[in-house]
Amino acid sequence: DLVDLSCYPLLGVWLLDKDRTLLYDLARNGKTIWEQRIGIVSTMTFVRAGQLDDTFAIAELFLNENEHLHDLLEKAVGWLLREAGKRDSERLANWLYPRASSMPRTMLRYSIEKFPEIERQHYLKLGK
């Protein structure tokens, strides 16, 4: 998809050393799912640079402000959480633990995809 292939190499790289408020605004107030998706997928650049804070913070926005997320947004958030977990699995586990029960199932499944089977089952039992 063009959004996924272009937003983090372009927008993410451009924002690497700048204020990232734009991504939060897109995630929270994007008029289309594609604008909202850009808000989270652009954080891939930061994840690859070891900067995970924005990914977790924007993921939190989707949990708090979007009661019925489109499945493409659930998948994107789960994907970026999984990528963040590849850099810091303990941080992802700690982030997920209090949220798994309120996360959309698709988002949770994507985020724990690389966990060992026993851990995956644990989080799935916490989930909806």
Where are these regions (language model features)?
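Alpha-helical scaffold domains
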Residues: D1-K128
